[in-house]
Amino acid sequence: MIARLRGTLLEKRPPTLVVEANGLGYEVEAPLSTIEALPETGREVILHTHLSVREDGQTLFGFRTRAERDLFRRLIRVSGVGPKLGLALLSGVDGEELVRCVRDDDPKRLTQVPGIGRKTAERLIVELRDRLDGVGGGSTAAPAAGADHPTGENDPVSEAIEGLVALGYKPPEAARMARNAAEPELGCEAIIRRALQRAVPRGG
């Protein structure tokens, strides 16, 4: 089991990262909260990881804190929630808010995440309610300097569209969301975060 990865950040293409360690390039999938907190490419990063092994391949998931990884592991134990959906949940709702939704019995907030219907949201709340002791999501870490700015020459809007599609949105919807959220000087991660925040109105 790979529990921790330390190396040079080569690529940031939400939700995918490439980290080079000891001459090997590791492809890592990470929630938006983790990607936003990382430095620019070329810098050293440390990720707490979870390796998912299935018949069709292996996927390495990375998180900026142990608490966020632990929350992910609790999520994927819920019936009907696999690693991909768990990643989408932690990208659409940050860890602390997810914990709040469970403790406040608020399934409506969770149903705004692609792939989460009413029944799945209610099941999440029921099954997670007694599993969250000591878990807060670890979302208090501040984003790294420069995280809200483009990290390469690629169009941040196009990369944001790709990221939203990877999180479960249909391409036309992802394009609309990204373009509506885009502003000059915003990088890919910031556009995705803004698009997700607009898609999930608070207090609704």
From Swiss-Prot:
SMART domains: HhH1 (SM00278). GO terms for biological process: DNA recombination; DNA repair. Gene3D superfamilies: 5' to 3' exonuclease, C-terminal subdomain (1.10.150.20), DNA helicase RuvA subunit, C-terminal domain (1.10.8.10), Nucleic acid-binding proteins (2.40.50.140). It holds the Pfam family RuvA_C. InterPro entries: DNA_helicase_Holl-junc_RuvA_I, Hlx-hairpin-Hlx_DNA-bd_motif, NA-bd_OB-fold, RuvA, RuvA_2-like, RuvA_C, RuvA_C_sf. GO terms for molecular function: ATP binding; four-way junction DNA binding; four-way junction helicase activity. Residues 1-64 are annotated as: Domain I. Keywords: Cytoplasm, DNA damage, DNA recombination, DNA repair, DNA-binding. Residues 144-153 are annotated as: Flexible linker. It is found in: Cytoplasm. Residues 153-204 are annotated as: Domain III. Its main location: cytoplasm. One of its GO terms (cellular component) is cytoplasm. Residues 65-143 are annotated as: Domain II. The RuvA-RuvB-RuvC complex processes Holliday junction (HJ) DNA during genetic recombination and DNA repair, while the RuvA-RuvB complex plays an important role in the rescue of blocked DNA replication forks via replication fork reversal (RFR). RuvA specifically binds to HJ cruciform DNA, conferring on it an open structure. The RuvB hexamer acts as an ATP-dependent pump, pulling dsDNA into and through the RuvAB complex. HJ branch migration allows RuvC to scan DNA until it finds its consensus sequence, where it cleaves and resolves the cruciform DNA. Homotetramer. Forms an RuvA(8)-RuvB(12)-Holliday junction (HJ) complex. HJ DNA is sandwiched between 2 RuvA tetramers; dsDNA enters through RuvA and exits via RuvB. An RuvB hexamer assembles on each DNA strand where it exits the tetramer. Each RuvB hexamer is contacted by two RuvA subunits (via domain III) on 2 adjacent RuvB subunits; this complex drives branch migration. In the full resolvosome a probable DNA-RuvA(4)-RuvB(12)-RuvC(2) complex forms which resolves the HJ. Belongs to the RuvA family. Has three domains with a flexible linker between the domains II and III and assumes an 'L' shape. Domain III is highly mobile and contacts RuvB. This is Holliday junction branch migration complex subunit RuvA. It comes from Halorhodospira halophila (strain DSM 244 / SL1) (Ectothiorhodospira halophila (strain DSM 244 / SL1)). The lineage of its organism: Bacteria, Pseudomonadati, Pseudomonadota, Gammaproteobacteria, Chromatiales. The gene is ruvA.
